Amino acid sequence: MASRQPEVPALEASAPLGKMSLPIGIYRRAVSYDDTLEDPAPMTPPPSDMGSVPWKPVIPERKYQHLAKVEEGEASLPSPAMTLSSAIDSVDKVPVVKAKATHVIMNSLITKQTQESIQHFERQAGLRDAGYTPHKGLTTEETKYLRVAEALHKLKLQSGEVTKEERQPASAQSTPSTTPHSSPKQRPRGWFTSGSSTALPGPNPSTMDSGSGDKDRNLSDKWSLFGPRSLQKYDSGSFATQAYRGAQKPSPLELIRAQANRMAEDPAALKPPKMDIPVMEGKKQPPRAHNLKPRDLNVLTPTGF
């Protein structure tokens, strides 16, 4: 490294080599270590006056510093003789600002990609035909994406699972509906079978049983705001047909009562049938004696004999 000698000779050359002297007026040429590494010439030993040379850390010009200065609007390039403190400050400032910006950009990109994938899936699954009202935790950008729960709720409303007020007049229709969800609502029955029909709105309260009392009368008055339904009567012989009110399932109490009546009428009908197991009768056969002949002993005899 003869070419790397100091350009100005040392003023205090009498200083010992072991001590680091601080000579006045010595300016060492700033050496970039990146250039040294890229130099194809072989490395030579250091100069002999090593102790008289004041070594300073050389900070190479980095690309990200240049980019940061351009982004901030500084057109001037950083000089090679940049001080250590300014370089450390710029190194500390730049990654923090760039990391924050990268964090925000990546978050927005991930959110957008997730929403697009959800939208694509819902479009494929056929769930895009229902409206969606967001709660206050969602942003305005996320409100346009539809959700599965709202579509299911809309399907339930279409299939007939309506509220109680809408279900009550639908129970008095003359023909049963095709969907099982909109069938007439099951009503609690009273103790008497004739009292269950009085809960329906009808023009003839004289058929009410005395056991139902004023409760059923109040019920018929309550639901009379939907309009009293007149029963259609036809002259078809000696009986009149009433409108079909829907199949009424028997209550568990009536099932228990009917089963008790059946047991009282015919107790043998509910007993389990007897199984006729044939018993093997006869004498026990004595164990048969072995009929071994002398030629069979060859099979039973071990080979060692």
UniProtKB/Swiss-Prot annotation:
Residues 193-210 have a biased composition (Polar residues). Transmembrane segments: none annotated. Belongs to the P33MONOX family. The modification Phosphoserine is found at S182, S183. Residues 169-183 have a biased composition (Low complexity). This is Putative monooxygenase p33MONOX. GO terms for cellular component: cytoplasm; mitochondrion. It comes from Homo sapiens. Keywords: Cytoplasm, NADP, Oxidoreductase, Phosphoprotein. A motif (Flavin-containing monooxygenase motif) lies at residues 67-77. It is found in: Cytoplasm. InterPro entries: P33MONOX (IPR026759). Pfam families: P33MONOX. Residues 37-56, 158-236, 259-305 are annotated as: Disordered. GO terms for molecular function: oxidoreductase activity.
